Amino acid sequence: TAMIDKRPKTPREVAAFSLFSMAEEAAWSDGALHHYLSRAGLDSRDAALASRLTYGTVQNQILLDWYLRHFSSVRLKKIAPRVLACLRMGLYQLILMDKIPAHAAVA
């Protein structure tokens, strides 16, 4: 697969790159996440956050898409896959992760 060459530096980058690979290459979440976690060299706490962001976004995609459809004037099919992945991940943090401050979720 043509995974992203850039080395992720943060838990959110690991999660975003994993979600991009899943959306664009039909990669499995486990394989994509493992690939980027191994390249990032995060400590266990940051690796756990990256895993939670990735799996949580995937597991709650139906709910997240419902919110996006409700509040967006643009149809989801018209949104670029990487933009949609970022919107889903940010929304997941805002509505389902109570310990993530809003400014961090959208940064």
Language model: regions and residue ranges:
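Class I Rossmann-like S-adenosyl-L-methionine
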Residues: 2-107
